[in-house]
Amino acid sequence: MKALHFGAGNIGRGFIGKLLADAGIQLTFADVNQVVLDALNARHSYQVHVVGENEQVDTVSGVNAVSSIGDDVVDLIAHVDLITTAVGPVVLERIAPAIAKGLVKRKAQGVDAPLNIIACENMVRGTTQLKGHVMNALADGDKAWVEQHVGFVDSAVDRIVPPSASATHDPLEVTVETFSEWIVDKTQFKGALPTIPGMELTDNLMAFVERKLFTLNTGHAITAYLGKLAGHQTIRDAILDESIRAVVKGAMEESGAVLIKRYGFDADKHAAYIQKILGRFENPYLKDDVERVGRQPLRKLSAGDRLIKPLLGTLEYGLPHVNLVKGIAAAMHFRSDEDPQAQELAALITEKGPQAALAQISGLDANSDVVAEAVNAYNATK
């Protein structure tokens, strides 16, 4: 089996790329970072530090790399069996034209073997969104062939991979936590279902997408935003602050009540899942910066993302949301010189005030009770 993975960054190398290579799949990375490409093609291997209670160093070998903006990547798409991505939500649209060109070449060369594409991004139904971008880049005459031969498979991914702080300055070295979860929608594949250790197949993906979004992502973001306000540098420092931990745990319990109501998750098992995530945030081997986790607050405050979507669920079912509201208020306070979205958020609040700004960003009714609650919490934490 041959696979092409877009995104040779830390998540690409430390998570999805590692799983594919470990499964014996012939793997090629595609990226724009020439330093990383050159290193991969010189060595064809790299080291992954898996940290937790039992620390280990794994070597991933037998890998190659191509530029994601050259002709080589188009040629590869014509012949591989699987394409995966870990490029970040905003970059999916940028890689779509190359994928479209590769699919056209695949069709022209008469390669009718099924191809499956899986976007492994921190977003809901990311592959479906990628499919939309790819279809927009195709001529009408090619779309039916793509629909017939190419599976666009949505997935939920979960592994904390902080930026590398390698003392060796090795551009390929990466550190990851022990925990990982890659759940894919088996109803969307073309051809036979793949057997890849570490890939879990389900016919109820949205339950797992929302479980991860409402728990890991919600908790991670609120920990970062409250931690930044309190002057903590890392997620571990923040979650060990009892006042922050109480709000984060409370928010995950509030979002969890939505999941239990919506999907029938077992309450005791979900409580254990929350505890596991709190333990992951405490991992002393992961130096995860609150500023990194908090970046892009406009996206994280949008209607379909980790703060507002669970809040909407509590409104739908008439459930408590006091801690989620505290997290939203903390997100509105997020400031970072390194993050354009943080600067845009600050400008919007200055221009329109917190009530109108939150309504514009989140899609919530400016005159609703819940926006008033969030504004009160925002003003109380100035």
UniProtKB/Swiss-Prot annotation:
Reaction(s) catalysed by this chain's protein: D-mannitol 1-phosphate + NAD(+) = beta-D-fructose 6-phosphate + NADH + H(+)
GO molecular-function terms, A-Z: mannitol-1-phosphate 5-dehydrogenase activity
Q: Pfam families in the record, alphabetically?
A: Mannitol_dh (PF01232), Mannitol_dh_C (PF08125)
Positions bound to NAD(+): 3-14
List this protein's GO terms for biological process.
Answer: mannitol catabolic process
Task: Tell whether Mitochondrion is among the UniProt keywords.
Answer: no
Q: Which GO terms describe its cellular component?
A: cytosol
What name does this protein carry? Answer: Mannitol-1-phosphate 5-dehydrogenase
What organism does this protein naturally occur in? Salmonella heidelberg (strain SL476)
